[in-house]
Amino acid sequence: SVSCAAASPVFNESTLRVASLTFAMLAYGLPVGDPARDKMCEVYQATSAALANPDLILDAGTIYFADPKAPDRLKTLIESTVGRLQVVDKLNIADDGVLAVIESGMMAGFALRPQSVASESQLEKVSNQLVTLTALNSDLYGSPERHPAIQLIELLRLFRSSGFRELVDRIRNTSVPAGGYEANPILSASDVLKLVMKKHKLSEDAAAYYLQLLTLPDPTDKNVGLWNGWTAAA
């Protein structure tokens, strides 16, 4: 069962969001060897440990529903989606061990145990449950993915993805020398660079610029100059 006292006052959805998005931004935007970039591996380990804590419960937002013609609709939907509502610490709670829903008349709050959704199949199951429940407020959020509960699931999916783990491994073990940028394919993807040079008959610098324009989100003149060590005179 779950009670309000079980919620963590330190690690919450905002903590996970900052850890996930900041990690990706610093890994991309800072040079290899930068202390802040290297520190992110410790942040990853600490975040992983927090998510693996069976006592951690994350707030996943609320829904509101009031219809005089269907006063039991919210309760019925909760019980058909999560399980039977029971009184715990004077609260009406449905709890399947992963997702808990606290019902209070016209409102229901969601709480999620991240330790229990470690696999993609578990994430998919709880995601489907939350999509069903948050559909009651589709007029407020416009689309299901804008509800905090669904955004929390997507953050968990991002943080636990193979791509995110590969990013962590790359920070720990990179071929790029200290001071260089992963965004420079001359340093980070020499094999791919050589293939592009051969196929398109380009110089090393031209091939690097071609790849940056093709794959990176912000290959501005300023950024490319920083990544590649180019100056206006060059």
Predicted regions and their residues:
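Short amphipathic alpha-helical interaction segments
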Residues: 227-234
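Catalytic cores of nucleic-acid ligases and guanylyltransferases
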Residues: 181-183, 196, 212
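Long, compositionally biased low-complexity segments enriched in polar/charged residues
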Residues: 1-186
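Short amphipathic alpha-helical interface segments
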Residues: 199-219
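Short, Lys/Arg-enriched N-terminal segment that forms or immediately precedes the first helix
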Residues: 186-199
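Residues within the helices of the helix-turn-helix
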Residues: 194, 222-223
